[in-house]
Each structure stands twice: as C-alpha cells, then as structure tokens.
C-alpha cells in the first residue's frame, strides 16, 4: 500500500467521524511511545495509524455509536446548566 486514504479505512470503520476519532487516538498512542503494529519506521505517526486501521489491526473495542455519544456527553458536561455554547 503506497498511499493510505480515508477510503482504504472506511470499510472497517462505520463513518468518517469515527475514523477521525480512532486515528487521532492511535496517533497519540504512537507519539507517546506505543509500538507500531506494522513495521513502518520511516512514516509519521498519523500515517502509521491509518495503515494500522486500513489493515484491521486497530479498531474500536465498542460500538461507534457508544464511542461518539460518550465524547458528546463529555462535552455537554462541561457546559454550565442553563447556558449554551455557540460555535462560530
């Protein structure tokens, strides 16, 4: 695999948003010193993470819906009661 694309990973991950979360988490693990599951020492951590996802070596350990809803619940809990947050 000369180049990794989102399309290479989508058959193994439900949607693009979940793919971003998974790739980000794995990239952070690699940058913190985790060993790559594939031998790509020359590539940067995000490329290694996407290659691992595309080959099925990295995946969510729970459903994507649970992972995403947990992320949103965490964000909601940081907003004080009665207030809203507007993104611009």
From Swiss-Prot:
Reactions performed catalytically: RNA(n) + a ribonucleoside 5'-triphosphate = RNA(n+1) + diphosphate
Pfam families listed in its UniProt record: RNA_pol_Rpb6 (PF01192)
Record carries keyword Nucleotidyltransferase: yes
A GO cellular component entry from the record: DNA-directed RNA polymerase complex
Entry keyword set: DNA-directed RNA polymerase, Nucleotidyltransferase, Transcription, Transferase
GO MF annotations, alphabetized: DNA binding; DNA-directed RNA polymerase activity
Function according to Swiss-Prot or TrEMBL: Promotes RNA polymerase assembly. Latches the N- and C-terminal regions of the beta' subunit thereby facilitating its interaction with the beta and alpha subunits.
Assembly and interaction partners: The RNAP catalytic core consists of 2 alpha, 1 beta, 1 beta' and 1 omega subunit. When a sigma factor is associated with the core the holoenzyme is formed, which can initiate transcription.
Family per similarity comment: Belongs to the RNA polymerase subunit omega family.
HAMAP family reported in the protein's UniProt record: RNApol_bact_RpoZ
Protein name according to UniProt: DNA-directed RNA polymerase subunit omega
Lineage: Bacteria, Pseudomonadati, Myxococcota, Myxococcia, Myxococcales
């Amino acid at each position: 695999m000369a180049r990794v694309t989102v399309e290479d990973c989508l058959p193994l991950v439900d949607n693009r948003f979940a793919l971003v979360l998974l790739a980000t988490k794995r990239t952070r693990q690699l940058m913190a010193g985790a060993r790559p599951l594939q031998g790509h020492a020359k590539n940067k951590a995000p490329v290694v993470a996407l290659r691992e996802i595309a080959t099925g070596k990295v995946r969510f350990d729970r459903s994507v819906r649970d992972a995403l809803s947990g992320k949103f619940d965490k964000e909601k809990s940081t907003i004080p009661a009665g207030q809203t947050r507007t993104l611009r």
